[in-house]
Amino acid sequence: MARAFPLERVRNIGIAAHIDAGKTTTTERILFYSGVVHKIGEVHDGAAVTDWMAQERERGITITAAAISTSWNDHRINIIDTPGHVDFTIEVERSMRVLDGVIAVFCAVGGVQPQSETVWRQADRYSVPRMVFVNKMDRTGADFLKVHGQIKDRLKANAAPIQLPIGAEGDLSGIIDLVENKAHIYKDDLGQNIEVTDVPDDMKDQVAEWRTYLMEAVAETDEALIEKFLETGELSVEELKAGIRKGVLKHGLVPVLCGSAFKNKGVQLVLDAVVDYLPAPIDVPPIQGVLPNGEEAVRPSDDKAPFSALAFKVMADPYGKLTFVRMYSGVLAKGSYVLNSTKDSKERISRLVVLKADDREEVDELRAGDLGAVLGLKATTTGDTLCSAEDPIVLETLFVPEPVISVAVEPKTKGDMEKLSKALVALAEEDPTFRVNTDQETGQTVIAGMGELHLEILVDRMLREFKVEANIGAPQVSYRETIRASSRGEGKFSRQTGGKGQYGHVVIEMEPGEPESGFEFINKIVGGVVPKEYIKPSEMGMKETCESGVIAGYPLIDVKVTMIDGSYHDVDSSEMAFKIAGSMAFKDAVKKCNPVLLEPMMKVEVEVPEDFLGSIIGDLSSRRGQVEGQAIDDGTSKVSAKVPLAEMFGYATELRSMTQGRGIFSMEFSHYEDVPRNVAEAIISKNQGNS
């Protein structure tokens, strides 16, 4: 089957922003103008195409990244609409991992918000080229150039407007295209009758100034253009377009557009810019991976290359389990068998679909650069690599943040116990930041996630999708443990009980690992002092001990263990003996490595009227917070601080009463930090049942 669109005419893009910037409305308009939907759906009416879960339509926020295919100007555009709420950071993270370009949507009134910075950092982590759409230009207080300034200052981006608004707030009547030097005047409410004319006389000076600014920014990304610009002071439309594209692909330039998705102004120009400036799969560096022999390798975006794809999302669906994949190379055909190289298991591709939100189109194959979904995969979970069994490779996986909050959950009726465990398994398969475990002492089921809203929505889904009513306990902080020193540890397990005995002996070196590295195991056994078949069980024993902690029962993170020595017995050694010896060696080493308790620190931003600034700062300090910055803008004070999550429960209610309901705040996970000794002692004694 031939390609419907050549690779250079494919765009895999994400639409990302902070909550309420109008991201889903922008996606809706893109689908309307490109012909996927024939009626405009509004988020506030609960009718948006990409918000297809019941909770999304009720709450007016996007929770899961819905993938939709559309086309514009002979280009295939695959769009992922991502959530703006910080509790759903993993959804943004996983979509960034598989995208080639991003439209960052900002509100013309609110500008750069804390969540915008998080999304920007995620795009930086995966080096995703991007452009900005400053939305809601029709709102009172809209200020395009102010937002452009914030993008430069707060996000440190080389942002250059390629448009200017004609009017603002209620008088927004059109948009100036600085590249073409033309005005687009909107003649009807649906934004379909557009008159392209010369720049209005009263804007000629402003347009000339910003056009020069754009030319300078573009020239800086290309030496040939710098020379021409310095000589003539001018760049042609073709040179500008080529220069902007080159700058975007090299991460040296961020074009800034404006409009109002809700009022149907500027969306077609956004689509034009996606086609003109954002990369095709062949414009971005080939995906990297690791071969079975440990060597690094790349897979080019090419149908003729060996097949490789990344599973970036798993969803329970009325028709079975849907696994969303990003195709990086080769062709994936319906009915074929492929290798899940992450888990070393074979998978059969029973059906392939391309999605249009909750509508789907069955296809016979997916090709390099495509986004689609597979039905019928058994073992594949988020972050796994699918590839050809003849050319195995494991692609770079997703970064998954540690959960920060946990609650105990139990079914309202004993009969629902089995349904509850099924629901929890299905939800954990979909969402890697959602963890389920059983408290060894109490036997309670504990669920952990990225925030209260995250867990609330998952509990809500249990009721709606799995018909399980559950009782939820009070939220608990997900503490972690780590080490601050290095040491050696030894574990010898020897048992003679008549007949065959048990023998395992392991020697390790333990040291602090890199931040966010979790548990890292290195095998340096030489000369066969411990046979190969006992290395994995030794590692498993250490890993299990790592997960149950040593100080207060919380998982140990960022620990590097090197197995350096040991011994075995021809008859008495077994996998179980080495698993126990590995665990003993781990416990022996860790107590000599200065273990400490860690707590999640949250990045908190509070906005209050100026009069309340003093009491807000005092209150944050009393919560063990470190105030990192404050700014006053039009009588509103903004305070940013790092505060332990343990001190932030109930803050929304406190803030309301302190500010007479006029304060707002946002909170997201920042990092883990050592718990002060006096606080740690209380937590440890409580966990050991001494309090």
Swiss-Prot record:
Transmembrane segments: none annotated. One of its GO terms (cellular component) is cytoplasm. GTP binds at residues 17-24, 81-85, 135-138. GO terms for biological process: ribosome disassembly. Residues 8-282 form the tr-type G domain. The keyword Cell membrane does not apply. Keywords: Cytoplasm, Elongation factor, GTP-binding, Nucleotide-binding, Protein biosynthesis. GO terms for molecular function: GTP binding; GTPase activity; translation elongation factor activity. It comes from the Bacteria. It is found in: Cytoplasm. Catalyzes the GTP-dependent ribosomal translocation step during translation elongation. During this step, the ribosome changes from the pre-translocational (PRE) to the post-translocational (POST) state as the newly formed A-site-bound peptidyl-tRNA and P-site-bound deacylated tRNA move to the P and E sites, respectively. Catalyzes the coordinated movement of the two tRNA molecules, the mRNA and conformational changes in the ribosome. Belongs to the TRAFAC class translation factor GTPase superfamily. Classic translation factor GTPase family. EF-G/EF-2 subfamily. This is Elongation factor G. The lineage of its organism: Bacteria, Bacillati, Cyanobacteriota, Cyanophyceae, Synechococcales.
